[in-house]
Amino acid sequence: VATVDCSDYPKPACTLEYMPLCGSDNKTYGNKCNFCNAVVDSNGTLTLSHFGKC
């Protein structure tokens, strides 16, 4: 199972680095920071589906 450590989030700003992750909402997030901020916003209901684009 793919996991991402989001314990250091949320962060006020994310870099433009492109390392896509696919969320359980079937949405592609541009990088870990964008994904983790979304995880925090979802109160933990969003999880990582897999690394790479959906």
UniProtKB/Swiss-Prot annotation:
SMART domains assigned: KAZAL (SM00280)
Source organism (scientific name): Dendrocygna arborea
Cell compartments where the protein resides: Secreted
UniProt-listed SUPFAM superfamilies: Kazal-type serine protease inhibitors
Residues with attached carbohydrate: 43
Domain notes: Avian ovomucoid consists of three homologous, tandem Kazal family inhibitory domains.
Disulfide bonding pattern of the chain: 6-36, 14-33, 22-54
Top-level taxon of the source organism: Eukaryota
Keywords, ordered alphabetically: Disulfide bond, Glycoprotein, Protease inhibitor, Repeat, Secreted, Serine protease inhibitor
Residues under site feature: Reactive bond 3: 16-17
UniProt domain Kazal-like: residue ranges: 4-54
The protein's name in its UniProt record: Ovomucoid
GO molecular function list: serine-type endopeptidase inhibitor activity
InterPro entries for the chain: Kazal-type_SerProtInhib, Kazal_dom, Kazal_dom_sf, Prot_inh_Kazal-m
PROSITE patterns named in the record: KAZAL_1, KAZAL_2
GO cellular component labels: extracellular region
Entries under Pfam families matching the protein: Kazal_1
